[in-house]
Amino acid sequence: MSEFKRISPEQALALRAEGAVVVDIRDPQAYAAGHITGATHLDNHSVADFIRNADLDAPTLVVCYHGNSSQSAAAYLVGQGFSNVYSIDGGFELWRSTYPGETAQGNAE
């Protein structure tokens, strides 16, 4: 894949069940208030370590608030060598309304 793909929450749920990595690029307070279960919080301070330690071929799902900022972040990850990147349409807001039981709370790390 030379570009990221936009996917629905339903497609993201299926990929997550198969072991896809989920990264949440929202601010730390929003992440702490609620995020996709198993998601890693990713920001300007943690992205370098994330990239260095990541499997660049693993499916990687990027989520933001509404599915807009995640597209830029997904494109950035593709530019860093990731080959299987997806932006979740509707962001965490749509995910939470679709799958309220698939969310967690708490700070990163």
UniProtKB/Swiss-Prot annotation:
Keywords: Cytoplasm, Transferase
Protein family per UniProt: Belongs to the GlpE family.
A GO molecular function held by the record: thiosulfate-cyanide sulfurtransferase activity
Lineage: Bacteria, Pseudomonadati, Pseudomonadota, Gammaproteobacteria, Pseudomonadales
Descriptive protein name: Thiosulfate sulfurtransferase GlpE
Organism: Pseudomonas entomophila (strain L48)
Documented EC number(s): 2.8.1.1
SUPFAM superfamilies in UniProt: Rhodanese/Cell cycle control phosphatase
Presence of keyword Cytoplasm: yes
HAMAP family named among the record's database cross-references: Thiosulf_sulfurtr
A GO cellular component entry from the record: cytoplasm
Cited InterPro entries: GlpE_sulfurtransferase, Rhodanese-like_dom, Rhodanese-like_dom_sf, Thiosulf_sulfurTrfase
Gene3D superfamilies found in the cross-reference section: Rhodanese-like domain
Domain of life: Bacteria
Function of the molecule: Transferase that catalyzes the transfer of sulfur from thiosulfate to thiophilic acceptors such as cyanide or dithiols. May function in a CysM-independent thiosulfate assimilation pathway by catalyzing the conversion of thiosulfate to sulfite, which can then be used for L-cysteine biosynthesis.
Compartment list: Cytoplasm
Residue positions of the active site: C64 (cysteine persulfide intermediate)
Catalytic activity reported: thiosulfate + hydrogen cyanide = thiocyanate + sulfite + 2 H(+); thiosulfate + [thioredoxin]-dithiol = [thioredoxin]-disulfide + hydrogen sulfide + sulfite + 2 H(+)
Record-annotated Rhodanese domain positions: 16-104
Gene Ontology biological-process annotations: glycerol metabolic process
